[in-house]
Amino acid sequence: MKIKSVELVKTIYKSNDKYPESLNGEFVFVGRSNVGKSTLLNILTGRNIAKTSKKPGKTASINFYKINNSFYFVDLPGYGYAKVSVEERARWRKIIENYFSKRAWNIKLVFVLIDGRHELQKNDEILLEWLKELELDFAIVMTKMDKLKNSERAKMIRYYKDLYGENYTIIPYSAITREGIDKIYELIEIFGGV
């Protein structure tokens, strides 16, 4: 897959903000704060479209990136730990819930980024169960895999495959080595990203 053009077309800050026109589907990137969503988007597009930070909570809005004038990459705010106010976290939750309820019909695939160094966190489990209830297809992207020794890596991949691998794709991924990028592109193509 070749990404020729990328354009930030809409940023959603409030649940009553208007969504952009629909295109040929949306590929959603969601995960805990500081799990690597913005870095992954930058790698996939070959551009620095998403701001990155060592501090959790940099993405505070829903960002719609038009890809090849055909479909969207949708970058959601992180959930879980972030040094932001309770009110700000509540706002993020509201816009995320609103997004999924209003745009589920146009979502092709949700990439759920999970820190592959750790077992499933409660917030991740809640999100995955919610996506199943909404009958949305998702793939689990295990981030930061380069930080694990081979034995730990094999153990964590087995752990996630035992939990979700029968029905969902598990992708070990590293921003450093670029492991998993080809699989993500492949899924985008399979699910209709042209």
UniProtKB/Swiss-Prot annotation:
Molecular function GO terms recorded: GTP binding; metal ion binding
Cofactor: Mg(2+)
Residues of the EngB-type G domain: 23-194
Key words of the record: Cell cycle, Cell division, GTP-binding, Magnesium, Metal-binding, Nucleotide-binding, Septation
GO cellular component, as recorded: cytosol
PROSITE patterns linked: G_ENGB
Amino-acid positions noted as binding GTP in the UniProt annotation, renumbered to this chain: 31-38, 57-61, 75-78, 143-146, 173-175
SUPFAM superfamilies named in the record: P-loop containing nucleoside triphosphate hydrolases
Binding site for Mg(2+): S38, T59
GO biological process, one term: division septum assembly
HAMAP family associated with the record: GTPase_EngB
Protein purpose: Necessary for normal cell division and for the maintenance of normal septation.
Similarity comment text for this entry: Belongs to the TRAFAC class TrmE-Era-EngA-EngB-Septin-like GTPase superfamily. EngB GTPase family.
NCBIfam families recorded: GTPase_YsxC, small_GTP
Protein name: Probable GTP-binding protein EngB
Species, as recorded: Thermosipho africanus (strain TCF52B)
Gene name in the database record: engB
